[in-house]
Amino acid sequence: MSNQSVKTDMIIVGAGPVGLFAVFEAGLLGLKCHLIDNLDRPGGQCTELYPEKPIYDIPSRPKVTGQELVDDLLKQISPFNPVFHLNQQAQSLERLENNNWQMTTSQGEVLEAPIIVVAAGAGSFVPKKPKYPDLEIYEEKSIDYAVYKMSKYQDKELVIVGGGDSALDWVMSLEPIAKKITLVHRREGFRSSP
């Protein structure tokens, strides 16, 4: 943690696909970028929620997984040497007398740039954990909040909780490899898209 600010051309809040592509576009203009993201790796929801799930709505890509998309974007921006500030959030933003912006992260890093890009998508990914005593004992053993490797669920009996797009997408994606899937949902109808 340093109070001395790091000066750059552009600060991007969010290291998902839009933030990564912003690095590419800025790089073409000769701008240096620093990215801030709450997660421990670039990729946003693509790597956090569906790294192995096919995505069908990326221009020029008939089908690509979330991880493949992020890997390709990281290759595309590597010549521009972006600096990542991971596992932290943008905490404060202040306009300076020189008309630059000063952003402080949750870890106390101070960045300064004339350009701020907010590419935060749906915001930082924080799972909605049920209020259940000692739940953390089972996390990463038998409770997962995201699917990172589908092969982990091969021939397993699974319980998926939720009624939104993500829950139903994972039921459909895991159905061919799981032994059994039970979907638990507390409402009468589903919130997912048709």
Annotate the PLM regions:
Residues M1-V13, L28, R41, F84-K156:
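FAD-binding core/adjacent interface of flavoenzyme oxidoreductases
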Residues S2-K7, I11-D40, S142-R191:
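Rossmann-like dinucleotide/flavin-binding elements
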Residues N3, T47-V110, F190-P194:
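N-terminal Rossmann-like dinucleotide/flavin-binding domain of flavoprotein oxidoreductases
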Residues F21-E25, Q76, E112:
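Residues within well-formed alpha-helices
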Residues V23-E25, T47-E48, K128-Y132, V171-S173:
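Short amphipathic alpha-helical segments
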Residues L29-G30, P51-K53, Y132-E136, P176-A178:
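Glycine-rich, phosphate-binding/catalytic loops in enzymes
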Residues D71, K75, Q88, K141-Y145, ...:
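Short, contiguous clusters of charged residues that form electrostatic/catalytic patches at enzyme active sites
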